[in-house]
Design a protein with these regions (language model features):
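Short helix-terminating capping/connector loops at secondary-structure junctions
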Residues: 53-58, 89-92, 283-287
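A short, N-terminal amphipathic alpha-helix
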Residues: 42-52, 224, 228
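Canonical Radical SAM [4Fe-4S] cluster-binding loop centered on the CxxxCxxC motif
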Residues: 2-39
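Auxiliary Fe-S-binding modules of radical SAM enzymes
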Residues: 2-5, 209-343
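Short acidic/polar active-site loop segments enriched in Thr and Asp
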Residues: 59, 93, 118, 187, ...
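Conserved non-cysteine loop/helix-boundary elements of the Radical SAM core domain that shape
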Residues: 28-42, 50, 65-187, 191-194, ...
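Short glycine-enriched loops at secondary-structure junctions
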Residues: 11-15, 192-197, 243
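Short acidic/His/Gly/Ser-rich catalytic and metal-binding motifs that mark active-site loops
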Residues: 16-20, 197-204, 248-250
Length: 343
């Protein structure tokens, strides 16, 4: 049952003065009109008419499309004024936005506080200096820490976005970024494998051979390790992988894009957990029949995307009987291996 609803407001990326190698938002913005602040009211009301507040505990208004705090302050305030009306009358619960680390300072946060903004996500992308430079991020590692500390000091919910497979990136650098993010203790995180988009410098780098995108299996392997680090730190992982849009689809994506990328990652984590338990059982007993268990929420991860985990265990352990079973006494993302005997 869905208890959290998001009302998206798309704000084109006109506020950002930077040109990251992977970003084509300026091209997108040239083709897309920003929603005028006066139209937000109608959009919010349209979404609210589809939401059952008897079921939905939290309604969040989220400004998508780039660095919100890079917009002129008058524009920010015009959008936020409309959002605040709905928050104060109890129709929405949270106001959510994303921005860059170098677009955060005390003056900006004081203003956001005035409009009762709840959540600020930072497009951190990497904690590695060389990766930031090669990606032309235009900010430093110090800027990241300063922004995170200020956001937490002012009492906002902090989200951190990390990318995997940027120029000059390595598996170890990605894992270190996840570890450093976990030490900051944000409440939220997103993990995005790099996809080469049209009209970007990264596409030119790919075409001239100076950038090689990760394969799908490489991206899954790295993201899996980052996911485990963040999850172990009790950080809510809001998204893993890019959403499909008109600009990103399997036909035109270069790099590690998959519409079910999160399930690929979570399926690998489930497979690891199951195999670890299975090997312990096999080393301890003569049983060759087992139930692999999860609750209904995690069952698709247990069997893997398109049944890949079922096939893996069948091929690797042909002499063992394995049944994939539901056990709704288990928590989400918990997997169990139990022995069974035929009666």
């Amino acid at each position: 049952m869905k208890t959290h609803a998001i009302i998206p407001i798309f704000i084109p990326h006109e506020g950002c003065q930077n040109d990251c190698v992977f970003c084509n938002q300026k091209k997108i913005s040239a083709k897309a009109e920003a929603m005028p602040p006066c139209e937000i009211k109608n959009t919010i009301e349209t979404y609210l008419s589809t939401i059952d507040r008897n079921i939905t505990k939290t309604v969040e208004l989220a400004f998508f499309g780039g660095s919100f705090t890079g917009l002129p302050i008058e524009t920010q305030n015009a959008y936020l004024s409309e959002a605040l009306k709905f928050k104060r009358n109890g129709k929405i619960d949270k106001i959510h936005m994303s921005t860059r680390p170098d677009y955060i300072n005390r003056e900006i946060l004081e203003n956001l506080k005035k409009f009762e903004v709840s959540v600020i996500e930072l497009g951190v992308q990497s904690f590695d200096r060389d990766v930031l430079i090669a990606s032309k991020r235009g900010h430093s590692v110090e800027d990241i820490y300063n922004a995170c500390n200020l956001i937490k000091e002012y009492g906002f919910t902090l989200g951190i976005q990390l990318m995997i497979g940027l120029p000059c990136d390595t598996k170890e650098k990605c894992i270190q970024s996840a570890r450093k993010a976990a030490l900051i203790k944000p409440e939220l995180a997103r993990l995005y494998p790099t996809v080469v988009l049209d009209d970007t410098e990264l596409l030119k780098m790919y075409q001239n051979g100076t950038y090689t995108p990760l394969s799908e299996s490489e991206a899954v392997d790295i993201t899996k390790e980052m996911y485990k680090i963040l999850a172990a730190a009790d950080i809510k992982i809001m998204r893993v992988g890019l959403k499909s849009t008109d600009l990103i689809c399997q036909d035109n994506a270069i790099g590690s894009y998959h519409p079910a990328f999160r399930q690929l990652v979570e399926g690998e984590i489930a497979k690891e957990a199951l195999e670890k338990q299975l090997l312990l059982k096999l080393s301890d007993s003569s049983f060759n029949k087992f139930h692999f268990e999860s609750n209904s929420f995690s069952f698709s991860n247990m069997i893997g995307n398109c049944g890949v985990n079922k096939a893996y265990f069948k091929d690797k352990y042909p002499d063992i009987s394995i049944r994939f079973s539901l056990n709704n006494a288990l928590a989400d993302y918990v997997y169990n291996v139990v022995e069974y005997k035929d009666i």
